[in-house]
Amino acid sequence: VLDLRTYNSRFSSEEVQQSVIESDEFAYNMPIFFQDKKSYISKLEKNNPYLKVINIESKFPNTLSIKCMDREEVFAIKMSDERYFILDEDLKVLEVLTSFDSTQTNAILLGGEISVDNVDASAGDFLTLNAGQALIEAFVPAMKLNNRDVSEQKALFESINIRYRNNPITARSEAYLELYDFNGLKMCIFEAEDMLVNKINCLLAAHAAFDPKDAGTFELRILKDSNGDIFAHQMQKS
């Protein structure tokens, strides 16, 4: 008989943990080494949108150990006036809402030149973006490497837009991040696919020194000079 155990330091509730243990997806009458663990992970993720299954280990003679953790709300994408996807850093749909306003404790609104491939996704699915996916997926880890956890990221940024432009020096098309804080300050990280961790570090330092009352007059730009050095430029709005 299969003995199912869960190991997890960050379950949100005993109810969630119990629902995993009692899931009818598991083949309790099948030998341990014939269990389809990939299928279990897929089904658990779909049926429990806020759950992240890290791995499932087989332990002789009859134990499956499931290591899980909570997923955190990070991003929101507006699909229509009454349809918003709430996403984690892996772009998993945690919820579908009919309305959404970004605050310092909920998700950061994503926009700009991005489009969603699977527009009919529902809670538990993973989104695929037609453009900008790699950059969005790199943003949260880059922030964490700058010692900003998810709650701090949400407190800093109201919205993030993916934009494209022709680089004025190389004339090549490049992606950049256009970010807004809750004072309305516009911040741009140019050539965002290059040295993003360092550029975010520069942005955070410049933002900390910026006077919020100037948010309507200036914007911050994070650039790289011809020597490869990253710097912040405070530019007056036209």
Residue ranges, per PLM feature:
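Charged, solvent-exposed interaction patches on well-folded alpha/beta domains
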Residues: 1, 21-43, 52-238
